Amino acid sequence: MDIEERKAQLKKLNARATQAKMDLHDLSEELPTHWEKIPEVAQRCFEAHVLLMDARKALAAAEA
């Protein structure tokens, strides 16, 4: 994967992580309604951010 492809992937992952963050935030504002969704939404947010951080590291390594 070249640097431009990595940047495009990073942009998509950033959008996904941002949406996951907003979903978690929205859920927190609705509490205690839908409290049972906390683990599911938090896990999605965690996984999105793991992928984002890994992609950032890979891009930095490719640019070095």
How would you name each of these model-derived features?
Residues 1-28:
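N-terminal acidic leader/helix
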Residues 29-64:
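Short, charge-rich amphipathic interface segments used for partner binding and complex assembly
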